[in-house]
């Protein structure tokens, strides 16, 4: 990338940070932003990552932001990356006590998140799409022909506004989990199946499918440390969608448990999401970190069976029944 293009990138980021929306949510003034966006610093640092040829880590972006962040005062005890991950989770699931206790660090977290989003937007524009690492959302023109287009537009707006993708990327670096890989993988499988059904003439709403698949596990980021994620994340997923007035997408997203297959009157969008969630599994490597993969139905059956609590003959038969419905769907 030429010096001119590097200068242009730095100028575009500065312009984005000077917009009223960012200034309002960060509490920074335009003068503060100009102090953080020292021209020489950003042009020197951007020359190291542009042109983008591979995925840029949150750590690499933090190292660029480290010096400007120091101008805002001391860093959080847990460091800026871990704190910003906690902070962005509380954007989705606000907590008055957390906000009050960490008010001194909110501007820094907002700044880091905005820079992450800027870099990841540029990354997305030049790198090949990877199904386990990002989302191929419907464009506005394609989405407009479906019934849930308005809700889907809201979903995409809040997905960006609340830094949900950036949250998932941080999650992969500051925790042992690979939640992004699972959610993105489920979205990929669901949309592959949904597009195939749509092409075959099956009446399916692609906006409903995409929004529900991309949002189906958002509740995992709302669960508190002492809460059982496998049981409560459905509740928190539903809460997020309800708080943003997305009733239809939220209903599909929150009801994606295998047991939700038991009712007979299941929508095709629900069936597609449950099928995709069933297929995209995670195991743990020797280092304790999650490994995401797309399994076949038989493998997925055994993985989920091993995780079920209090399995007796009645519960096993229920599980076999819902599994058979997925097999019938796949055969179809």
What is each model feature region?
Residues 162-167, 207-218:
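A short glycine/small-residue-enriched secondary-structure motif
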Residues 208-212, 221, 252, 272-273:
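Active-site alpha-helix of zinc metalloproteases
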Residues 161-165, 187, 191, 238, ...:
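An amphipathic alpha-helix signature
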Residues 2-154, 174-204, 215, 225, ...:
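Divalent metal-dependent phosphate-bond-processing catalytic cores, especially two-metal-ion Mg2+/Mn2+ enzymes
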Residues 150-168:
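Short alpha-helical hairpin
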Residues 220-264:
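Helix-adjacent hinge/juxtasegments
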